[in-house]
């Protein structure tokens, strides 16, 4: 079996990754950068975000300050690798979002964010079927269930259980807080538009913390967000307690 090791950029994690590499090779695994069967992630949820989007199964070692989804502790890595050899694991799948405009094509594990580029409010709309919801504030987040545990949680203090087939729309610091958050089915298509503010708006589009492009109102750009056909896959060897790691 071919393993790729993806490590958090910290001295402790890098040193631990050397130990894991030797351990895996001694157990008969082949370490590779290309076409792996499993990606072994050493870090926290931020490291996971950078490794998970290709849909290759993830073996995650909790080596970060906070991790809600990586459940293998460093002292259990040998046991996990031995279980991997014996195919004694389950695969947990997580939904991802796809966002497209004429200049943007991205996949997000946690969330898509539309945020101001300058220190002023964003005036726009979220369109779902025939329903148009206007908003003005710092922006809007479109989050998966696992994404509701992250940035969206900071704004709403609401957690969406991973088994709920929903998408959470969060309005960030709205001027008129008539709607703070909205949960819709994952089957819906979401269209985000910039509305007429009397001057050109230029806002950032952010996918899992990375700026992937801009929307400009004068060009009448729209961002379409749908459920991706691609699933993130995380291998489970032990029981993961829901929401464990979020508050510690």
Swiss-Prot record:
Keyword check for NAD: yes
Cofactor entry: a divalent metal cation
Superkingdom of the source species: Archaea
Function per UniProt: Involved in the regulation of the intracellular balance of NAD and NADP, and is a key enzyme in the biosynthesis of NADP. Catalyzes specifically the phosphorylation on 2'-hydroxyl of the adenosine moiety of NAD to yield NADP.
Stated family: Belongs to the NAD kinase family.
Organism annotation: Sulfurisphaera tokodaii (strain DSM 16993 / JCM 10545 / NBRC 100140 / 7) (Sulfolobus tokodaii)
E.C. number: 2.7.1.23
Entry binding sites for NAD(+): 45-46, 50, 110-111, 138
GO cellular component: a single term: cytoplasm
Primary enzyme class: transferase
GO MF, one example: NAD+ kinase activity
Reactions catalysed according to its record: NAD(+) + ATP = ADP + NADP(+) + H(+)
InterPro entries associated with the record: ATP-NAD_kinase_N, ATP-NAD_kinase_PpnK-typ_C, NAD/diacylglycerol_kinase_sf, NADK
Annotated catalytic residues: 45 (proton acceptor)
Protein name: NAD kinase
Subcellular location: Cytoplasm
Main location group: cytoplasm
Keywords recorded for this protein, A-Z: ATP-binding, Cytoplasm, Kinase, NAD, NADP, Nucleotide-binding, Transferase
Listed GO biological process terms: NAD metabolic process; NADP biosynthetic process
HAMAP family on file: NAD_kinase
């Amino acid at each position: 079996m071919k393993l790729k090791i993806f490590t958090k950029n910290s001295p402790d994690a890098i040193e631990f990754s050397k130990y894991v590499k030797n351990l895996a090779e001694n157990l008969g695994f082949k370490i590779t950068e290309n076409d792996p069967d499993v990606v072994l992630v050493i870090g926290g949820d931020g490291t996971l975000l950078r490794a998970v989007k290709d849909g290759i199964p993830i073996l995650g070692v909790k080596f970060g300050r906070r991790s809600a989804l990586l459940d293998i502790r460093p002292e259990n890595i040998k046991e996990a690798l031995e279980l991997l050899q014996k195919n004694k694991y389950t695969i947990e799948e997580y939904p991802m979002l796809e966002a497209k405009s004429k200049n943007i094509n991205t996949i997000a594990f946690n969330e898509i964010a539309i945020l101001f580029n300058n220190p002023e409010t964003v005036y726009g709309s979220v369109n779902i079927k025939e329903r148009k919801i206007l908003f003005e504030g710092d922006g809007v987040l479109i989050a998966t269930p696992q994404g509701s545990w992250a940035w969206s949680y900071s704004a709403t203090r609401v957690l969406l259980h991973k088994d709920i087939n929903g998408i959470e729309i969060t309005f960030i610091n709205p001027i008129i807080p008539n709607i703070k958050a909205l949960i819709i089915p994952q089957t819906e298509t979401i269209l985000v538009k910039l509305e007429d503010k009397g001057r050109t708006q230029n806002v950032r589009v952010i996918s899992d913390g990375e700026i992937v492009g801009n929307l400009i109102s004068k060009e009448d750009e729209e961002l379409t967000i749908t459920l991706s056909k691609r699933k993130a896959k995380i291998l489970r060897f032990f029981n993961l307690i829901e929401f464990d790691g979020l508050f510690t």
